[in-house]
Amino acid sequence: MPTRLDIVGNLQFSSSTDNGDEDQEADVTACFVLPSPSSFSKLSILDDPVEDFKEFLDKAREDFKQRWENPAQNTACLDDFDRIKTLGTGSFGRVMLVKHKQSGNYYAMKILDKQKVVKLKQVEHTLNEKRILQAIDFPFLVNMTFSFKDNSNLYMVLEFISGGEMFSHLRRIGRFSEPHSRFYAAQIVLAFEYLHSLDLIYRDLKPENLLIDSTGYLKITDFGFAKRVKGRTWTLCGTPEYLAPEIILSKGYNKAVDWWALGVLIYEMAAGYPPFFADQPIQIYEKIVSGKVKFPSHFSNELKDLLKNLLQVDLTKRYGNLKNGVADIKNHKWFGSTDWIAIYQKKITPPSFSKGESNGRLFEALYPRVDGPADTRHFVEEVQEPTEFVIAATPQLEELFVEF
C-alpha cells in the first residue's frame, strides 16, 4: 500500500443515517502534506519523574499556557546550519537533514515555501503547527528546537529520529503482535491525554506520522492539522481511512475523532491493514459511516471489545468521549497489563519476541538499526534535490506570516 494522502477542504459525500439526518454534500480537495521525519523533546520531563499523571497534567497546562501566550520567534537562522541532504519532499516544501554548526547536533529541518503555502491555502494550518510545536513538551510528541523565516521560506528545526516511520516497518513485516501493538497504543493514549488536556485535537493519526527511535519508543510527528479547540470544529482534514464518521457527515466534531483514529491505528497495527479500505475514498466513507467492522480471526476477544468501543459511530457510546474520559480506555482489559506510569517514564522495554517472531525484520522494526546520529537508511525515498536554494532579495507575503 502506498503512502496515503491527507485531505483538507470539503467533501462530496451523501449518506442517509438511522437518526434521520439530511444528506451532506460538498467538494473535496486533496493534497500531499509534507511529512516531518523528525522528533524533538525540549527538556526531558523524565528527569523529574511524576507518580501522579493528573498532577503532571495540571503542571503541563500551566507550562503550555505560558509558551502558547508568549510564542518564540526567529530563534536561529539558516546560516547556523550545514545542509546535508534532502530526506523528503512535499507539495509546498521539503525536509532536510542538517547539522547545527555550533553544537554539532543533527536535526531535520522542515522548509516551507511561503508562496506554495499560500497557494494551497495552508497558511492557518502552518501557523497553527508552529505555535503548537513551540508550546508542547511530552515524551511521545515531536517538539521543536528552532524556528525562523526569511524572505522566501518558513523553517522548523526538529530533532532527527533516524529509526524511520512506523508505516515502512509495518508494511515490511506485515503486522505487529498484540503485545507490540499495545505497547505502541499506550504511548498514543498518553500523548492524546496530554494534548486533549490542552484543548488540542491532533486529527492526523496514522503510521506515516509515527516515528520509532532506537529504543523502540514512538514520537508523533506532523502537527499540520492539529488545532486548539474547546468546543466543536467543522474543518475537513485528515486521511480518508482514519476519518471519523462525524467528520465525513459534516456534523461538527470534537476530540472524540482522535479516539476513533486510535481504534483505526490499533486495528491496522494488529491486522496489517486498516478496518475501512477501498479503491476510492467515497467507498471508504460509506464503510466508515455504516459502522460495520470485520475482525480477523486472530484478534483476541479483549482487542475486539476495545475496538468496538473506539470504532463506535454513536458518540454517546464511544470510549474517550464518555463521562470517565480516557479512563475507560486505560482501564480496559486489553490494557490490563499496562503500567501507564512506567510507559510514560520509558522504563518498559518493547515486549519480548514470541516463538516464530524472532526474525531480523521484526527486530529491525522494534529496534531500528542506526549507525550514528546522521544515519538515513530508514528514510527509503531517494530524493535528488540540491542542498542550496535561492532566497528572494525582498520579503514575500510577509504580512501573512507575521506570527511565525
Curated annotation (Swiss-Prot):
The keyword Phosphoprotein appears for this protein: yes
Keyword Nucleotide-binding appears in the UniProt entry: yes
GO BP terms in the entry: positive regulation of oocyte maturation; signal transduction
GO cellular component: cAMP-dependent protein kinase complex; cytosol; nucleus
Annotated InterPro entries: Kinase-like_dom_sf, Prot_kinase_dom, Protein_kinase_ATP_BS, Ser/Thr_kinase_AS, STKc_PKA
Null allele phenotype: RNAi-mediated knockdown of isoforms a and b in neurons shows a temperature-sensitive adult onset paralysis of the distal part of the body resulting in the loss of backward movements and an inability to lay eggs. RNAi-mediated knockdown of isoforms f and k results in no obvious phenotype.
Regulation of its function: Binding of cAMP to kin-2 regulatory subunits induces dissociation of the heterotetramer. The released catalytic subunits are active and able to phosphorylate their substrates.
Phosphothreonine: residues carrying this PTM: T233, T376
GO MF annotations, alphabetized: ATP binding; cAMP-dependent protein kinase activity; protein serine kinase activity; protein serine/threonine kinase activity
Keyword line: ATP-binding, cAMP, Kinase, Lipoprotein, Myristate, Nucleotide-binding, Phosphoprotein, Serine/threonine-protein kinase, Transferase
Result of altering H125Q: Loss of interaction with kin-2 resulting in constitutive activation
SMART domains in alphabetical order: S_TKc
Binding site for ATP: L87, G88, T89, G90, S91, F92, G93, R94, V95, K110
Domain of life: Eukaryota
Enzyme Commission number: 2.7.11.11
Gene3D superfamilies named in the record: Phosphorylase Kinase, domain 1, Transferase(Phosphotransferase) domain 1
Function comment: Essential for larval development. Controls the rhythmic contraction of enteric muscles probably by regulating G-protein coupled receptor aex-2-mediated calcium influx in GABAergic DVB neurons. Plays a role in the control of oocyte meiotic maturation by gonadal sheath cells. Isoforms a and b: May play a role in the regulation of neuromuscular junctions.
Entry protein name: cAMP-dependent protein kinase catalytic subunit
Gene that this sequence comes from: kin-1
